[in-house]
Amino acid sequence: MRFVDRCRLKVIAGDGGNGAIAFRREKYIPFGGPAGGDGGRGGDVVFVGDGGLSTLLDFTYARTLEADRGEHGMGSDCHGRAGADRVEKLPVGTQIFDAESGELLADVTEHGQRVIVARGGKGGRGNLHFKSPHDRAPRRAEPGEPGEARELRLELKVLADVGLLGFPNAGKSTFVAAVSAARPKIGDYPFTTLTPILGMVEIGGGVRAGGSSFVIADIPGLVPGASEGVGLGIQFLRHVERTRALLHLVTLDPGEGREPLADYRALRKELKKFSPEIAERPEIVVLTKADLTEVRDAYPKLKARFAKAKVKLHLISAATGEGVPELVRELAALARKREEPAEQDG
């Protein structure tokens, strides 16, 4: 399925039905009073968060979402039926903006969260409402009110506890596959991962077994200049915004001119350009591919160089599992630590 994380569309709520002009027509009552019913209310356009969705692809095909109008009122004081709501599911993590003003209308962060983005118009009143001592047979009724219409911009930002960063081919996809049930595409060429990949990491059997879990997001490969649109560009840097902690993978690859500390500094620079606040979040820095002899031999010197830069460098191998359990526990602790203040504030 193609990953789409932003789109624009129009939403049109239903118009209210018109009130009716009608009179009682009963035997022996030749001049019955007013009996016009009210028009029905127009339907709303509603978005509902769905944790099972991961793309806005469907909205690239349906550029206009329209709810039903209310039925008109009828005689015998019969009211029109309300128009049906137009209900559409959205991926959890979607932000809804007014396309013209740029105002954030809603942030869909929970499964089942409902957001009314366009309200249906009220139904008009029938002539029964206009009867008075001075006018016992009113011949007027109200038209229904128009439903709201607006242009929206939808932006999806993945919801994850830990954001996984690193140059292309730093081993991010291999790590996600090793610690979760996610199966990202893995290859030996740049930008193997072209969309954010979410993986659920379970500890001690997961929540159901009395353990814990957290979500990790493999953000597509960042390169110098990403904050200005180079490579896959800023389109995916946005997905780091909701993470609580960062896991930064570096690798030793002299054949491609990769130097771990230089790579780390380059991507830290991009993060700071994009968002100084995100750059200050807790992070763990890891040298991958410990199963390779050249990596293991170089680790002591690299660790010392990172230490001079006041950065602790871990060593793991996603292929053999070396260092992975300890790293997962440390990430889980970071995710919990960041979550606790938010819960206390709430």
Curated annotation (Swiss-Prot):
Domain (Obg) ranges: 1-159
Subcellular location: Cytoplasm
PANTHER family, per database record: DEVELOPMENTALLY REGULATED GTP-BINDING PROTEIN-RELATED, MITOCHONDRIAL RIBOSOME-ASSOCIATED GTPASE 2
Assigned keywords, A-Z: Cytoplasm, GTP-binding, Hydrolase, Magnesium, Metal-binding, Nucleotide-binding
One GO molecular-function entry: GTPase activity
Gene Ontology biological process terms in this record: ribosome biogenesis
Record's subunit section: Monomer.
Lineage of producing organism: Bacteria, Pseudomonadati, Myxococcota, Polyangia, Polyangiales
Domain OBG-type G: 160-336
Enzyme class: hydrolase
GO cellular component terms, A-Z: cytoplasm
Recorded name of the encoding gene: obg
Name of protein: GTPase Obg
Main location: cytoplasm
